[in-house]
Amino acid sequence: MRHFLNINAIELDDVVDLVHRALAIKAGRSVIQSNLTVTNLFFENSTRTHSSFQMAENRLGYQQIDIDPQQSSMSKGESLTDTLKTLKAIGVDVAVIRHTVNNWYDQVLTATGHEIPHLINAGDGSGQHPSQSLLDLVTIYEQFNHFAGLNIRIVGDLAHSRVARSNAEILHHLGANMTFSGPKDWQPNDFGKFGQFVAIDDDWENLDVVIFLRVQHERITQTENQNFSTKQYHEQFGLNRVRYERLKAAAIIMHPAPVNRDVEIADELVEAPKSRIFEQMNNGVYARMAILEYTTEATHATH
């Protein structure tokens, strides 16, 4: 049974095929209407990911069952594993899950084998965010038509960002030149496998893509939150007008959103010409349609 849990566990050729498929759907290629049933199970609040999956499911003809964990038997102590077995027993084909726990799926897969729906990871703690990573790849490829050789910098709260972790690895494997910048206390040691840590303004004029990350106040310590200065962070690691103008004409800026305006990106620049933030959201629907097709091994017209 196929699942979509970690984009870096998928063959690179399949990842590239998913990018092409998402763009083909966006261009109007036909999709097969499904008679499958999907459950969206979100243990963390979400606007973009949740609604984007719902839109993707609607466009593919899925029957939807949304479950609020707080109003389910999990609030009585039922395990996620038993909940998924229950959903499979009543006919659910796919479960889209966002969870607070890193790698929540490992225990589920060990305990259940094939007695569960197809699983799609909609974000796990500070671990992985594979569907966001795919839509970012779609957005980058749509702009440049390749990944190899692009100079890409990820800026901000690297330590607590599942987006950063997914993107750093997959973009490195696709041949991009990766650099990272952010507060020293938020620089994970293992990112050195994928690129270099640099000062934010180093070689700025040669960057093709800059991905800014949200400061994840819900994941940092109380002391860090108390000592956090919005003004200081924006000056040191934010996108201001000077940095924006120094980017080359063809460069793009991205952000997984929600954006803390005037923190990661100046308010006036969130929708500036080089910004692709809302285009990322648009591409998210097509990327998640491609993910649903891939996970259920649905057939479709060639791209």
Curated annotation (Swiss-Prot):
Gene3D superfamilies assigned: Aspartate/ornithine carbamoyltransferase
Give the reactions, separated by semicolons, that this protein catalyses: carbamoyl phosphate + L-aspartate = N-carbamoyl-L-aspartate + phosphate + H(+)
What Enzyme Commission number(s) does the record list for this chain?
2.1.3.2
Record keywords: Pyrimidine biosynthesis, Transferase
* Binding, carbamoyl phosphate: R48, T49, R98, H129, Q132, A257, P258
Q: Which GO terms describe its cellular component?
A: cytosol
> What GO biological process, any one, is recorded here?
amino acid metabolic process
Q: In which pathway does it act?
A: Pyrimidine metabolism; UMP biosynthesis via de novo pathway; (S)-dihydroorotate from bicarbonate: step 2/3
For this protein, the record's SUPFAM superfamilies field holds:
Aspartate/ornithine carbamoyltransferase
User: Which residues take part in binding L-aspartate?
Assistant: K76, R162, R214
**What InterPro entries is this protein classified in?**
Asp/Orn_carbamoyltranf_P-bd (IPR006132), Asp/Orn_carbamoylTrfase (IPR006130), Asp/Orn_carbamoylTrfase_sf (IPR036901), Asp_carbamoyltransf (IPR002082), Asp_carbamoyltransf_Asp/Orn-bd (IPR006131)
User: Quaternary state and partners of this protein?
Assistant: Heterododecamer (2C3:3R2) of six catalytic PyrB chains organized as two trimers (C3), and six regulatory PyrI chains organized as three dimers (R2).
Q: What does this protein do?
A: Catalyzes the condensation of carbamoyl phosphate and aspartate to form carbamoyl aspartate and inorganic phosphate, the committed step in the de novo pyrimidine nucleotide biosynthesis pathway.
Entry's family note: Belongs to the aspartate/ornithine carbamoyltransferase superfamily. ATCase family.
Protein name from the UniProt record: Aspartate carbamoyltransferase catalytic subunit
Q: Source species, please?
A: Leuconostoc citreum (strain KM20)
Taxonomy, top ranks, is:
Bacteria, Bacillati, Bacillota, Bacilli, Lactobacillales
Q: Which gene encodes it?
A: pyrB
